[in-house]
A protein has these predicted regions:
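Non-catalytic interfacial helical region
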Residues: 2-201
């Protein structure tokens, strides 16, 4: 873009709400002093465009969190009403950081979607499976000051295999509960998991 740098815009998308929530917190933590304005598709393209432009004029800085807007297209569903907002965001050079959140995967075959992904820094949060989910759990334990024994990790991997498609949010809730139950050594063992685990599904 000529003159001025592109404002800080990021797109977070995917089918794993827990990871989207984590990425959202990360983005917002960079702007602790700014109020957050959340707008979704119900606000309508015109109102959102007005908000983005009016704030550029009046200079009250804030973070815009724009959720599930049809500027990201699905095949067979096109809404021309959103095109001006799409163009505004693609060329946006105001001062307000914008976080775009889209709770689904994005069809990259659609030209407009591909253009968004090419232009705007983005982070995909897709369902974690198998080893990736075990890795997430290990990191989550570590960040809370807990360790898992190797046989506990194997046990968790086995459960994840068995359950198929278990969301991160379920595992997070489970482990939050374990953290509260364990006193003394912050170690999660296979025996503990066998005695205290919930059954998914």
């Amino acid at each position: 873009m000529k003159g001025g740098t592109m404002a800080h815009i990021q797109l977070i998308y995917g089918d794993e709400p827990q990871l989207i929530e984590e990425e959202k917190r990360k983005f917002l933590s960079a702007y602790p002093d700014l109020p957050v304005t959340v707008l979704d598709d119900e606000a309508g393209p015109q109102k959102i465009s007005e908000k983005l432009c009016e704030d550029s004029l009046f200079g009250d800085q804030k973070v815009f969190c724009l959720v599930n807007l049809p500027i990201i297209r699905k095949s067979g569903k096109n809404s021309d009403a959103w095109v001006p907002l799409y163009e505004l965001i693609m060329e946006y050079n105001g001062n307000n950081p914008i976080l775009l959140i889209y709770h689904d995967m994005i069809d990259k075959r659609i030209k407009q979607n591909k253009a968004i992904l090419d232009k705007i820094p983005n982070h995909q949060c897709k369902r974690l499976e198998g080893a990736d989910l075990v890795m997430w759990i290990r990191q989550y334990c570590t960040s809370n000051g807990f360790k898992m024994t190797p046989d506990a990790q194997e046990y968790v991997a086995h459960l994840i295999d068995l359950w198929q498609d278990v969301p991160v949010s379920f595992m997070r809730t489970e482990f939050d509960r374990y953290f509260l139950q364990i006193t003394g050594d912050k170690v999660i063992t296979k025996e503990f998991l066998e005695e205290n685990g919930s059954d998914y599904g």
